[in-house]
């Protein structure tokens, strides 16, 4: 994921969070039904500026906030590859913003396994290996429950201190510094049938 794609993802994340805050504070932001149609032809001509068009239906539909069962259930209308792409997108957005600690601490940590599987599936093996080092340090597996992940981080921090943060920092730096092929786009455009979509989903909009 190059810097332009990443900036687009982070911008959307900021806008999404801002809209939620406005809803809470002013009640001026509401949800609306958005219709989208992504055909094989659309996907084959995809570029980095329209990358999030592929992700947005999953982003708005698949829940990461209500437990693992709901996460899987809310993803039922999408392909496995679409679910993996969402997990990878969440991973990059969170790690690039606040590191692996933030990714695991926040609700986004629920997608940790799909992120690793997605990296492997999309032939992004360098990313898979980098994240696997963090998972291995956490004992080889990570809970899908946020409270359990929070306690895991507390225990590791208390037990290993600076060593723990060194492992995280090294994994973070890899994400910040890595310049590789655009494997997500390559995979999507090589397998467009896995990412087609037609339907409606709820999204936020500002009434002002």
Describe each model-derived feature in a short phrase:
Residues 2-23:
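Intrinsically disordered, low-structural-confidence terminal and linker regions
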Residues 19-95, 101-112, 118-208:
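Extended, alpha-helix-rich binding/interface surfaces that flank or overlap catalytic cores
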């Amino acid at each position: 994921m190059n810097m332009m794609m990443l900036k687009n993802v982070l911008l959307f994340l900021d806008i999404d969070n801002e809209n939620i805050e406005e809803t809470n504070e002013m009640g001026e932001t509401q949800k609306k039904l958005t219709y989208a149609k992504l055909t094989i032809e659309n996907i084959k001509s995809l570029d980095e500026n329209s990358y999030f068009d592929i992700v947005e239906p999953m982003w708005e539909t698949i829940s990461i906030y209500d437990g693992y069962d709901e996460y899987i259930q809310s993803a039922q209308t999408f392909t496995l590859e679409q679910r993996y792409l969402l997990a990878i997108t969440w991973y990059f957005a969170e790690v690039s913003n606040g590191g692996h600690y933030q990714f695991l601490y926040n609700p986004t940590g629920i997608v940790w396994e799909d992120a690793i599987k997605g990296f492997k599936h999309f032939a992004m093996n360098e990313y898979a290996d980098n994240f696997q080092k963090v998972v291995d340090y956490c004992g080889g597996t990570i809970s899908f429950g946020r409270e359990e992940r929070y306690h895991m981080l507390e225990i590791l921090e208390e037990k290993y201190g600076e060593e723990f943060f060194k492992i995280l920092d090294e994994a973070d730096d890899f994400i910040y510094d890595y310049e590789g092929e655009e494997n997500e786009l390559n995979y999507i455009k090589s397998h467009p049938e896995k990412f087609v979509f037609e339907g409606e989903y709820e999204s936020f909009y500002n009434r002002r």
